[in-house]
Design a protein with these regions (language model features):
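CheY-like receiver
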Residues: 37-43, 50-127, 131
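Conserved acidic carboxylate
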Residues: 8
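Extreme N-terminal starter segment of soluble prokaryotic enzymes
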Residues: 1-4
């Protein structure tokens, strides 16, 4: 099961992403929600997660400060109403950069990209047969 956290200080945006995630990936488990840099750092220290969905502008600063305080090697889908932070986001572990309001198809595409890069593909019977024969 994929575990993720959502870092978002706007209640409406949080509810929308949560709704979309339940619809698009019902098998994913949200392990926590943070609304500030401080809460996000504490959440990262406590939770073992596979993915982060992170708003860039939080009420107490830019979310990049989270990773200065607590560096992580976790894939991140950034969300924001501003396109000026894209370059900085991609220098981190960014899987994607979604502009608000978030489009469900774009979130789905970002999740597919995450899955292609980070989730092991189940071996088909034909692949297992090849392994047994040649390895």
């Amino acid at each position: 099961m994929i575990k993720y956290i959502l870092i978002e200080d706007e209640r409406f945006a949080y509810e929308e992403v949560k709704r979309m995630m339940k619809k698009l990936r019902a098998d994913y488990q949200m392990s926590g929600w943070a609304v500030s840099i401080e809460q996000a750092v504490e959440l990262l220290k406590q939770e073992n997660i596979d993915l982060m969905i992170v708003d860039i502008r939080l009420s107490d600063g830019l979310s990049f400060e989270i990773f200065e305080q607590y560096p992580v090697d976790i894939p991140i889908i950034f969300t924001t109403a501003y396109d000026e932070y894209a370059l900085k986001a991609f220098k981190l572990n960014s899987m994607d950069y979604l502009l608000k309001p978030i489009d469900e198809k774009e979130l789905d595409a970002a999740l597919c990209k995450f899955e292609r890069r980070n989730c092991p593909t189940p071996k088909t019977p034909a692949y297992r047969q090849l392994e047994e024969t040649y390895l």
